A protein has these predicted regions:
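Immediate post-signal peptide segment of exported/extracytoplasmic ligand-binding proteins
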Residues: 20-47, 131-142, 268-271
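Extracytoplasmic small-molecule ligand-binding "clamshell" domains
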Residues: 25-93, 101, 247, 260
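Short helix-initiation/N-cap motifs at beta->coil->alpha
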Residues: 53-54, 68-79, 130-131, 165-179
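Extended ligand-binding regions for polar small-molecule ligands
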Residues: 54-62, 121-132, 141-142, 149, ...
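A conserved helix-loop-strand patch within extracytoplasmic ligand-binding domains
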Residues: 65, 94, 101, 107-153
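Ligand-binding clefts/hinges and TM-proximal coupling segments of bilobed small-molecule sensing domains
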Residues: 66, 131, 146-159, 164, ...
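A ligand-binding cleft/hinge motif common to bilobed small-molecule-binding domains
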Residues: 76-79, 91-101, 156-157, 183-218
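Periplasmic-binding protein-like
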Residues: 111-115, 197-238, 260-271
Length: 271
């Protein structure tokens, strides 16, 4: 009789939910280009790495979720997020008012700037001593930029007489600059230094402008993109980012890839 009672109690516990399987770990899908050196790119062995990848792993590690990276072309990045192909954009995307009309962003994890690269000794005189552009010297100048970036907005707003040439990849910018198809290019200075100017192919080229950081165009910095309506996840991401800022992890990540750190003062006091 005791055995029957024990068996009945065991069945009751199992069927009433007393026995539960461990909860599956949360999984977050991260969209990035996978070709944007040194921020998110594949090594010769096919390993996805870069500053953005380290940031993504750092954030999601603090959150306690699993991460899956999804490669996506740049000009389709926001549409893919809105189509639920991934949960987050961690791909060096600048926070701008235009983009914030469609998606939400975390606090910045990197400053956002642009800089012109051209041939050494060309004496283009594109900028005045105070750092402002000289529109007259941009007239008819062939300026290469990557498609769907904020650099096109800067040129249109400041030197509209320039002849803009659009490219699908950053690598194509360097090639046409070398071949003389463009006079200058506008791009990210950190990436330009690492991938072009520090290489033999870029020895005859250099920066021909100061760093340009107009927040109205480039935004307040680079952030994590997320679909609107996911406020709880956004709060967790911001909390994780603040931890990475405070413990020096972001600076550590930058020094793995860049010849200089992204300055701490740019991160202090972000809310």
């Amino acid at each position: 009789m005791k055995k029957l009672i024990l068996l009945a109690m065991t069945i009751l516990v199992l069927t009433s939910g007393g026995f539960t399987q461990p909860a599956a770990a949360e999984s977050l899908r991260v969209g990035c280009e996978c070709t944007y050196f040194p921020f998110n790119y594949r090594t010769n062995d096919g390993v996805l790495t870069g500053y953005d990848i380290d940031v993504a792993k750092g954030i999601i590690g603090i959150i306690g979720a699993d991460v899956k990276f999804v490669c996506q072309k740049w000009d389709g990045m926001i549409p893919a997020l809105l189509a639920n192909k991934f949960d987050l954009i961690i791909a060096s995307m600048s926070i701008t008012e235009k983009r914030m009309q469609k998606i939400d962003f975390s606090i910045p994890y990197r400053i956002s700037v642009g800089q012109f690269v051209g041939k050494k000794g060309a004496n283009l005189d594109l900028f005045n001593k105070d750092g402002s552009p000289n529109p007259a010297n941009f007239k008819g100048l062939k300026v290469g930029i990557e498609r769907a970036t904020t650099y096109e907005n800067w040129i249109s707003a400041n030197v509209p007489s320039a002849n803009i040439l659009l490219y699908d990849t950053n690598e194509a910018l360097y090639l046409d600059l070398q071949n003389g198809r463009t006079d200058v290019i506008m791009t990210n200075p950190m990436k330009a230094f690492l991938k072009f100017l520090s290489k033999d192919k870029g020895k005859n080229f250099g920066f021909v402008s100061p760093p340009l950081d107009d927040p109205k165009i480039f935004g307040v910095g680079v952030g994590v993109g997320i679909a609107k309506g996911r406020e709880d996840l956004l709060k967790r991401i911001n909390s994780a980012l603040k931890s990475l800022i405070q413990d020096g992890s972001l600076e550590k990540y930058s020094l793995k890839y860049f010849p200089f750190a992204i300055h701490n003062e740019k991160w202090e006091g972000v809310e």
